[in-house]
Amino acid sequence: MFRYKQVMVIRKDLKLSKGKMAVQVAHGAVTAALKVQKEKPEWFKAWFHEGQKKVVVKAENERELFELKAHAEKLGIPTALIRDAGLTEIPPGTITCLAVGPAPEELVDKVTGHLKLV
């Protein structure tokens, strides 16, 4: 049973290729995990040792990512907002993904529980 999880939220409106989406999600997962390891080491250790549960969901647009980020931060959940370098499919600086946690599952669900899986 998982008590901690990490959720990556990808923008639907960008219509990223599967490969591009995978890379953006990976950037988010690593960046946020390192942030949590530093800011909430007890959460990181628990998440890491129970199998590192990750979920990928979708948001409508950039505005929704910022709303989710603000909600997560109000609850004390570290986040990572990912901006693309713009070398392939989209313009430089485009915000593609928000990573939430890893954090206690019940907290993360308050932020992302209503979003649909990719």
Swiss-Prot record:
GO terms for molecular function: peptidyl-tRNA hydrolase activity. Keywords: Cytoplasm, Hydrolase. Its EC number is 3.1.1.29. It is an enzyme of class 3 (hydrolase). It catalyses: an N-acyl-L-alpha-aminoacyl-tRNA + H2O = an N-acyl-L-amino acid + a tRNA + H(+). Its main location: cytoplasm. GO terms for biological process: translation. Gene3D superfamilies: Bit1. GO terms for cellular component: cytosol. It is found in: Cytoplasm. It comes from the Archaea. NCBIfam families: arch_pth2, PRK04322.1. PANTHER family: PEPTIDYL-TRNA HYDROLASE 2 (PTHR12649), PEPTIDYL-TRNA HYDROLASE 2, MITOCHONDRIAL (PTHR12649:SF11). Belongs to the PTH2 family. The natural substrate for this enzyme may be peptidyl-tRNAs which drop off the ribosome during protein synthesis. This is Peptidyl-tRNA hydrolase. It comes from Thermococcus onnurineus (strain NA1). The gene is pth.
